[in-house]
Amino acid sequence: MRSDRIKKGFERAPHRSLLRATGLNDGDFEKPFIGIANSHIDIIPGHYYLQEYGRIAKDEIRKAGGVPFEFNTIGVDDGIAMGHEGMKYSLPSRELIADSIETVMNAHQLDALVCIPNCDKIVPGMLMGALRVNVPTVFVSGGPMKAGHLHDGTPIDLNTAFEAVGKRAQGQLTDAELYEIECQACPSGGSCSGMFTANSMNVLCEAMGVALPGNGTVLALTPEREALVRRAARRAVEIAADERFKLRNIANRDAIHNAMVVDMAMGGSSNTVLHMLAISREAGAPLSLRDIEEIAGKVSHIAKIAPSLATVHMEDIHRAGGVPAVLREAARRGGIVREGALTVTGETVGERIRDARTADPELIRPLENAYSPVGGLAVLFGNLAIEGAVVKTAGIQPSMRRFTGAAICFDSQDEAIAGIMGGKVKPGHFVVIRYEGPKGGPGMQEMLSPTSLIMGMGLGESVALVTDGRFSGATRGACVGHVSPEAAEGGVIGLVQDGDRITIDVEARALTVDVSDAELARRRAGFRPKRRDPGSSWLRRYAHLVTNAANGAVLRSTDL
């Protein structure tokens, strides 16, 4: 066992002495040492109860013949960090989480790992760190929260609350109506109830085979979710000494492909593209945006969940058959699902989905009745996004799939929010928010506040938005993000001027600004990208090392 390096031989007597101080005895030194990477934090609704799941996991590991060692990672709640400088820390936290997993696991030479994440950047951060360590690993998330309901039974979620702010600003909601939404949108613990970033990533972990069936859709704080935690912990002990289940053997190129198939079939958060680019690099099987667009062109969009369809939430998809049913339906298009991929349970993907059934064909549609013959995410290219940009097509109104508008430019999210609230944005505008990329922000803030304002103010079918920042999984509308190169590295988005005509064409996979090459060259001659002092040692280091969105916003190591 790997842990023999800290517990075997006379020269490890000091190490054993320290371990005995934690409660270990002679018999424990013959057992596998299992790490539990928890992400309990009180301020995040999807994480405040994870301490109990960690306790359950430790109990099960002991019963199964292992020795558990629980440690914690940090976490950021993107919803609470939204719309202020705190959002600059969200994406960078992914790297800190990955580094912390690598540090604890390798410093102590633990044999296997149970990861208990749930929200936002915590899932990909744990997966990236675990891939570096490459020991047998099982993921089990905290689970999605229930949908909320208004007094008349209308289902709502966190996105309802964000969009309600725009409606209140327009006088379309009273303070009492806004208060009801505020109090009912998030009725329980768990990751926010739609196909937002957290649930998208937990679904993708299930599709990759690094988590047990049900991981993406079983509700938080239920007996069924607790049973998943118990099974995951036991499984980690069972596979601790089995080389076949090293994480890179599970999360390989086929598994990553399957994750992107489910992502396209369910119209996941656009953040998944950013994270899967980064995860694939840690797995040694790097994806490119071109690879992702190729997958998108072959996968039908068969399930719509909030925010794309406001009445459907993760609990509904679970009742309809969950991720196995989505994969099984997608697999009817021969060869699109890599059914031979091994999962952490020891089954192949094909075996896992063989008996899956769709209980509601309106929630998980057959291929013949798909929402679209292509995936719910798309990668766009053009002179405004030479290296690519990402759009969640699942959330775009049909009338906005091809749209040309006059640019109205803002050099920060704060400026954009003030401009939208102040009435500067009119029908026919193409809002440009720049200097919000990984380097420029720094931290690549999510633009949920401005996009929710646009929707809430009734501009969703007459205004589009483009940014080198990113979006919450709750964003809907004609919103294009991840523009690369970003403004801070000299991208064309930094050269756009008010009034320039910008076109998004989803079918053509194009994002262009109607300005000649000669004029762009003239503008570039006098262009100096803006530089912000983030006022933070960590963010300053991050801005120096981070790559652009087309490369997953991973940190470069060549300068170190």
UniProtKB/Swiss-Prot annotation:
The reaction(s) this protein catalyses: (2R)-2,3-dihydroxy-3-methylbutanoate = 3-methyl-2-oxobutanoate + H2O; (2R,3R)-2,3-dihydroxy-3-methylpentanoate = (S)-3-methyl-2-oxopentanoate + H2O
Residues spanning the membrane: none
InterPro entries: Dihydro-acid_dehy_C (IPR042096), DihydroxyA_deHydtase (IPR004404), DiOHA_6PGluconate_deHydtase_CS (IPR020558), ILV_EDD_C (IPR056740), ILV_EDD_N (IPR000581), IlvD/EDD_N (IPR037237)
Cofactor detail note: Binds 1 [2Fe-2S] cluster per subunit. This cluster acts as a Lewis acid cofactor.
Cofactor entry: [2Fe-2S] cluster; Mg(2+)
Keywords: 2Fe-2S, Amino-acid biosynthesis, Branched-chain amino acid biosynthesis, Iron, Iron-sulfur, Lyase, Magnesium, Metal-binding
Binding site for [2Fe-2S] cluster: C119, C192
Active site: S472 (proton acceptor)
SUPFAM superfamilies documented for this protein: IlvD/EDD N-terminal domain-like, LeuD/IlvD-like
Entry EC no(s): 4.2.1.9
A single BP term in Gene Ontology: L-valine biosynthetic process
A Gene Ontology molecular function term of the record: dihydroxy-acid dehydratase activity
Similarity field: Belongs to the IlvD/Edd family.
Subunit structure: Homodimer.
Classification via HAMAP family: IlvD
Name of the protein described by the UniProt record: Dihydroxy-acid dehydratase
